[in-house]
Amino acid sequence: MARAERAVQRLGGARMHDLALVSRFLLRSEAIASSFIEGIAPNPKNIALAELSESDEPVLGLSEAAQQVARNMTIVRTATQALASVDQLTPGDLEELQIALVQERPDLQGVRIQQNWVGGSSYHPLEAAHVPPPAALLDDLMRDLTDYLSGAAHSPIIQAALAHAQFETIHPFPDGNGRVGRALIHTVLTRRGLTPDAVLPVSLILATRRDEYVAGLTAFRFEGEPDSPEGVAGINRWVTVFADAVGHAAEQALVLERELTQLRNEWQSMLEEGRRRAGRVRAPRRTSAVLMVLEGLPGTPILTPATVVRMHGTSLSGAASALSELAEYGILSTVSIGRGNRAYMSPDVLNLITVRERALASPAFDTAVSPPSWKVPALPPEGR
């Protein structure tokens, strides 16, 4: 626990803004919407194009998987921020999130009214890995959980661990329990001020170390007196697994922060050299469109002039000029989005996100040491 807390505290001196901007891409796996796209890994470029299509410009040729992932990233990000800001969470708040996540399946929306189970046969729970409580108990269990989420009886990491495990144990919905349960981790850490922008990829670590995760949850679900030595040991085992994941997530976030800082330094050098060669002697003003685009690039690696206008309030001509200038210097490249339209993208950011996600999927956090343990995008080609 102390190691995890120290690792998170070290993030306080990092460029948290950058980490917040790219966190939604690292948490891409949490946005997988339904079983028909489970196991498909849309790459960061396709997801960024899908986000662009949602907000600024229609993009042709997008896969349904990329669009679904982009939509659910927006849903989870918005819901987490909303849940983190309310004084008292209610079961209805969690139900609203679940309904938004399974909007394409009205028959699976809301609190379940039938028994469900995890693992084993689809027809009976005899070989299930876990059988959640009966539907008749859900109202009381969910009120108890949201009351706990609204308080501060334990430290943030312990609270996030217990809330996540209890929610996964209750399994209150017909579908979407995993995604809601993972969102609760970020909700707690944000509510308690530990990670103001929900940047820690905790659930990716738990997914990578799935055997430890499942063993920890199983220990937490000890059937017997909760205050017995066995019950306490089970809770402690789960909290240890979770705290270890938080510590690793914070350490990997620091690695990403250092890599982003290196990228920014490279961009600054490329900008200065490009302007020198173009005879632009004066440095751009801090409020110039060029610098504003560079500032937001980690979070918006694919953009159009309309994106720049929406984000930074520049003129359309100023936005177009800034993007063209950055492309001229090799910081951005262009990508077709259909019908003669083009967008600008940062290969550096997209490649970095892919490399980091692959590393997070490796039990050793290094694919040269151990391969990814779940489906991830292909390694980007060498070079810029």
Annotated model-derived regions:
Residues M1-R384:
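FIC/Doc superfamily catalytic core
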